[in-house]
């Protein structure tokens, strides 16, 4: 007996169209256009997950640098001092500390300055 792939094909197409929900124009209801748009969107999503990590690191460094300069240090001198003093705070924590607890950040920066 001949086996047709109607159910599987419909399910596969519906999965793509479901992912394309909210798109404008033919990209939301024309399978071929929707498939192209979804494929591109998934590519961008993969790329931007890596990009987000870089963007946040850059943001943290800018914040730390600004806070370090208020206590008379540059970013590089602060990081070098923290390494010498064996203080294992990462950039995310330092950035949060600079915003939420400036006096605590100043204390850590002074330890780094002394090292």
From Swiss-Prot:
Single annotated GO MF: rRNA binding
Keyword annotations from UniProtKB, A to Z: Ribonucleoprotein, Ribosomal protein, RNA-binding, rRNA-binding
GO cellular component: ribonucleoprotein complex; ribosome
Pfam families associated with the record: Ribosomal_L20
Coiled-coil ranges from the UniProt annotation: none
One biological process term in Gene Ontology: translation
Gene3D superfamilies registered for this protein in UniProt: 6.10.160.10, Ribosomal protein L20
InterPro entries named among the record's database cross-references: Ribosomal_bL20 (IPR005813), RIBOSOMAL_L20_CS (IPR049946), Ribosomal_protein_bL20_C (IPR035566)
Domain of life the protein comes from: Bacteria
Job description of the protein: Binds directly to 23S ribosomal RNA and is necessary for the in vitro assembly process of the 50S ribosomal subunit. It is not involved in the protein synthesizing functions of that subunit.
Family per similarity comment: Belongs to the bacterial ribosomal protein bL20 family.
UniProt-recorded name of the protein: Large ribosomal subunit protein bL20
Gene this protein is translated from: rplT
């Amino acid at each position: 007996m001949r086996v047709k792939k109607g159910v599987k094909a419909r399910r596969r197409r519906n999965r793509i169209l479901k992912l394309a929900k909210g798109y404008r124009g033919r990209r939301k209801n024309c399978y071929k256009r929707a498939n192209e748009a979804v494929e591109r969107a998934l590519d961008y999503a993969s790329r931007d997950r890596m990009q987000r990590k870089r963007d946040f690191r850059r943001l943290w460094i800018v914040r730390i640098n600004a806070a370090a300069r208020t206590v008379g240090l540059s970013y590089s001198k602060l990081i070098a001092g923290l390494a010498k003093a064996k203080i294992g705070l990462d950039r995310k924590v330092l950035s949060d500390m600079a915003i939420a607890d400036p006096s605590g950040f100043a204390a850590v920066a002074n330890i780094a300055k002394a090292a």
